Amino acid sequence: MFEYLKGIVAKIDPAYVVLDVNGIGYKILCPTPYSYQENQPATIYVEQVVRDTGITLYGFLSLEDKELFLKLLSVSGIGPKSAVAIMAAEDTDSLASAIQNGEVKYLTRFPGVGKKTASQIVLDLKGKLGDYVKKSAVATDLTPSLQDALLALVALGYTQKEVDRITPKLAKLPENTADGYIKEALALLLKK
């Protein structure tokens, strides 16, 4: 019903924000409520979910995040609260990359996601997030030292899937030497 709401952020809670739109306060459950600032204007992309227990608004920073939420909802066994919890636990680029690469073990890290549900997520969504993953990869401009580090990781025996999953995180770090990137990459890879 709603695509987005524009207004002033009236309140921020760990699970939701209250957005004042022309004097009406909308409670919107968000995976990342602290991305907004109180008493500041905001546009929140929303999805209205109607259940027997009530009507709930779920909000997102971007239209792409909202689309990822809807795709997670299409998976058997994933409800709106689980989808928000999954999106809150990890940045969406890494999440989309893990699904695209079929990393079931990685997906079991999320709250309420066991091996069966993780397998179902991969089964239902693998191949359907290509545009989302490509957008994040194209937006990432890799420095020569980062490219060298990624090649070294593959030479060390890590799979291309594992390297692709951590590449967006490494690209967001301050520019470093190849050795510095390798140390950061190993810390991320061993953190599984």
Swiss-Prot record:
Annotated region (Flexible linker), positions in chain: 137-140
Keywords on record: Cytoplasm, DNA damage, DNA recombination, DNA repair, DNA-binding
Region ranges (Domain II): 62-137
One Gene Ontology term from the biological process aspect of the record: DNA recombination
InterPro entries assigned to the protein according to its UniProt record, in alphabetical order: DNA_helicase_Holl-junc_RuvA_I, Hlx-hairpin-Hlx_DNA-bd_motif, NA-bd_OB-fold, RuvA, RuvA_2-like, RuvA_C, RuvA_C_sf
Renumbered residue ranges of the record's region Domain I: 1-61
Domain of life: Bacteria
Cytoplasm among keywords: yes
Region spans: Domain III: 141-192
Molecular function terms from GO: ATP binding; four-way junction DNA binding; four-way junction helicase activity
GO CC, alphabetical: cytoplasm; Holliday junction helicase complex; Holliday junction resolvase complex
Subcellular location: Cytoplasm
Family note: Belongs to the RuvA family.
Comment field on protein domains: Has three domains with a flexible linker between the domains II and III and assumes an 'L' shape. Domain III is highly mobile and contacts RuvB.
Function field: The RuvA-RuvB-RuvC complex processes Holliday junction (HJ) DNA during genetic recombination and DNA repair, while the RuvA-RuvB complex plays an important role in the rescue of blocked DNA replication forks via replication fork reversal (RFR). RuvA specifically binds to HJ cruciform DNA, conferring on it an open structure. The RuvB hexamer acts as an ATP-dependent pump, pulling dsDNA into and through the RuvAB complex. HJ branch migration allows RuvC to scan DNA until it finds its consensus sequence, where it cleaves and resolves the cruciform DNA.
Quaternary state and interactors: Homotetramer. Forms an RuvA(8)-RuvB(12)-Holliday junction (HJ) complex. HJ DNA is sandwiched between 2 RuvA tetramers; dsDNA enters through RuvA and exits via RuvB. An RuvB hexamer assembles on each DNA strand where it exits the tetramer. Each RuvB hexamer is contacted by two RuvA subunits (via domain III) on 2 adjacent RuvB subunits; this complex drives branch migration. In the full resolvosome a probable DNA-RuvA(4)-RuvB(12)-RuvC(2) complex forms which resolves the HJ.
Protein name per Swiss-Prot or TrEMBL: Holliday junction branch migration complex subunit RuvA
Source species: Lactobacillus gasseri (strain ATCC 33323 / DSM 20243 / BCRC 14619 / CIP 102991 / JCM 1131 / KCTC 3163 / NCIMB 11718 / NCTC 13722 / AM63)
